[in-house]
Amino acid sequence: MDAVVRPEPQTTELHRTIDWKDAFWVASGVPALVLFSIGGIAGTVGNPACAVWAVSMLFGFVQSFTYAEIAGLFPNKSGGASVYGAAAWLKYSKLIAPLSVWCNWLAWTPVLSLGCTIAAGYILNAFAPIPAADAPAVQQWLATHGGKTAVDAAAALTPGIRTWSMLDMTLIGVHISLGATFFIGVALTLIVFAIQHRGILGTARVQMVVGLLVIIPMLVFGIVPFFNGHVSQANFSPFVPLATPYAAAPGAWNRSGWTLVLGGLFIAAWSTYAFETAICYTSEFKNPGRDTFNAIFSSGLLCIVIFTLVPFTFQGFLGVKGMISPGVVDGTGVAAVMADMVGGGALTKGLLVLLMVLALLLSTMTAMAGSSRTLYQGSVDGWLPRYLSHVNTHGAPTRAMWTDLTFNLMLLSLTSSDTASFYFVLALSNCGYIIFNFLNLNAGWIHRIDNGHIARPWKAPAFVIAAGAVLAFVNAMLLGAGARVWNPHALWAGFVAAALIIPVFWFRHYVQDGGRFPARMLEDLGSVDGQLGERRAGVLPYVALAGGVLVVLVSAWVFRP
């Protein structure tokens, strides 16, 4: 039996002020995550890229039903599936439970820095563009500088703000830069923080307006090209992976090709699974029993449409050669492509730049809302330092938000430096996300065994829970096979980042709480005085963990980049 300790008094608690429609709008930033890696996946996988997005989205949708069920067990918790899943693992390991929460936060919080990096790139392109090779200024420069190339001309005519940097260095093979992109990204991050400071209801209202401005155009660009003849069947043939990433030469369905496809599925999961954030707000729902399922189901349907249509039309319009162009790979040229897809001119492109900035800010607002509540609930439940359990009078977890902000200002120095560092952070973040998904998909059946007597507002069919458990091991394979496609150090760096929870949890649990858990941690499961109850699942959770580790190691060995 675990003794319990009462948490320190809080200024206030999260407020029950929203319903599922508000959560839907808060999660409406998830479809914009397609913009983060649409070029990277196409440049890595080739013509099967659109199928990669569709398959990954199918995985995410099936998994969401497990998360919807376990969220219903905890009407008084916030923070998302990682928090609800952690309660299942607690009986079996004090360390695995906080690992779930930590890895979820590691996955979500970098959205702020990654999104603001791309948005800053859009802003720089609008006000200080790099001249195109056929620009009049370039031609004039070449005429007066004999023997020079268009590359020389572009370098000479590039505005100084594009190359200026207060700090430029390489640390452990990763480029760090404090240039214009960094400082614009800082400004955008502060704007997101200011909006979030008003609480979840105010955030939902802002995101509803921004979401409509973003989602409707994305639907237009996903549908119109089918009717104006801008989707070419030839751009999907031959339907084989690339021989080498970012080179348009077709490869084959051999081990090398499958490695690239699994790498694409790995990084796509970071975007396509992310609508599970809709259940981060259970303790803020007016009617959690109804709102929890409706929120994640409606968000999932929206994501199915966006994540299926947009990659398909992009590829059908551009082809692989267009998809691997630098502007598409780094995300800053997507607006121009969208304008061309619907036949727009300069005005349309300008409006789309604004919409893309709004889309990226929408995704960062979604990320801060969810990740800060994960930190908050992790603190309330005794996983993370007590400092994070404070909320302001609007019901916003401000100390968790400040932690998110500070961490992402540091990440911005990496993500804003170059494309390689951007994808390293993305891959590292996704290692945490896959670990979280593995633990929480298994938490579904553990809760069924250990807490089957607890009423569930919505209960998934047994075969769906079983399918989620199978997908847990599919995700483990994607982790082992796919992470190193994006960076040779990503997999092991991801394990190191995940292990950082050990000193954090040790400090909270043994230093701050004296080895005891807060009394309210398991109140939704009917726990009395912190009793964890019988381990009815026996050794099965340990078998699942061992199996997951084995799958990661074997797939990492078999699918070596």
Each model region followed by its residue ranges:
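C-terminal membrane-solvent junction of multi-pass transporters and transport-like membrane proteins
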Residues: 177-180, 390-396, 437-487, 507, ...
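Membrane-interface "cap" regions at the ends of multi-pass membrane proteins
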Residues: 1-50, 54, 60-68, 76, ...
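Hydrophobic, membrane-embedded alpha-helices of multi-pass small-molecule transporters
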Residues: 18-36, 56, 64, 184-191, ...
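Membrane-interface loop-to-helix entry segments
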Residues: 180-240, 296-300, 426-439, 466, ...
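TM-loop-TM module centered on a large, flexible mid-protein loop between adjacent transmembrane helices
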Residues: 82-90, 124-155, 239-252, 295-365, ...
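Extracellular loop-to-transmembrane helix junctions
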Residues: 34-141, 145, 159, 165-174, ...
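Hydrophobic alpha-helical segments and their helix-loop junctions in multi-pass secondary transporters
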Residues: 121, 126-128, 212-246, 313-318, ...
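Membrane-helix boundary/coupling elements in multi-pass transport proteins
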Residues: 79, 103-121, 267-285, 346-385, ...
